[in-house]
Amino acid sequence: MSQLSQQRILSGGSPFACKVCGKLFSHKSNLTEHEHFHSREKPFECNECGKAFSQKQYVIKHQSTHSGEKLFECSDCGKAFSQKENLLTHQKIHTGEKPFECKDCGKAFIQKSNLIRHQRTHTGEKPFICKECGKTFSGKSNLTEHEKIHIGEKPFKCNECGTAFGQKKYLIKHQNIHTGEKPYECNECGKAFSQRTSLIVHVRIHSGDKPYECNVCGKAFSQSSSLTVHVRSHTGEKPYGCNECGKAFSQFSTLALHLRIHTGKKPYQCSECGKAFSQKSHHIRHQKIHTH
């Protein structure tokens, strides 16, 4: 801080105050930069990738990601970071510190950004909108992953079989096919699952819990994904379009089945006669011919 700035504050002079949040600044230029937060204006652009920021200090920090320089190293595990605040956040993994606590449910987080994102599960806020289909998301990373559906990008590849996925979570789910690991077991019926979320959804079969209710007709569902698909029956939304013929579908799984018409893929083969089918339901129906 300059001597003039110090004198201004110590003398009780007129610092520059933000009209939105009341934060005080010793220079008008600092106030102007701060106000970009509220206006969401991002006048500072990275020359390398074009990413824009509200303050100059953030673009300077960001530019270190292009240089590859990582000056800040963790003394516990040796991992290095290009920015000091990223190191400080990382070190909380080792200390177990979670200073940001949700007032609604008490869950604590390492980063404030994670708390803000979590709080949207209580408020239902989904501020990130897909420009292609209008679907909304609570986090920007969720939107980014979703957008890969529209561009057909599949950057996550299985090392075992080569199957590629648009989202990392789907690759992780898929990999359990190869390992066969199912560590999550239902106390009611003993059925085991490879993922905890799958167990939680399954338990609702026993409890009858249906926490996701349609605002239009009141129908309730055990899974949020089921509610999302159901709502499209009211809105008529069909976000999944076929690149071959243009036909659109309300569910991605339905699009995947439809695509087999164009590719000719028939993964379900009858063990009795060898006839192959593109859909599992057709395969099951066919097998009844042999049992009768």
From Swiss-Prot:
Localization per Swiss-Prot or TrEMBL: Nucleus
Cellular component terms (Gene Ontology): cytosol; nucleolus
Crosslink (Glycyl lysine isopeptide (Lys-Gly) (interchain with G-Cter in SUMO2)) position: K28, K51, K56, K173
Zinc finger residue ranges, C2H2-type: 16-38, 44-66, 72-94, 100-122, 128-150, 156-178, 184-206, 212-234, 240-262, 268-290
Main location: nucleus
Record Gene3D superfamilies: Classic Zinc Finger
Protein name, as recorded: Zinc finger protein OZF
Organism: Mus musculus (Mouse)
Tissue: Expressed in heart, brain, liver, lung, skeletal muscle and kidney, and at much lower level in spleen and testicle. Expressed in lactating mammary gland.
One annotated GO molecular function: zinc ion binding
Subunit structure: Binds DNA. Interacts with SUMO conjugating enzyme UBC9/UBE2I. Interacts with the telomeric protein TERF2IP.
Keywords, in A-Z order: DNA-binding, Isopeptide bond, Metal-binding, Nucleus, Repeat, Ubl conjugation, Zinc, Zinc-finger
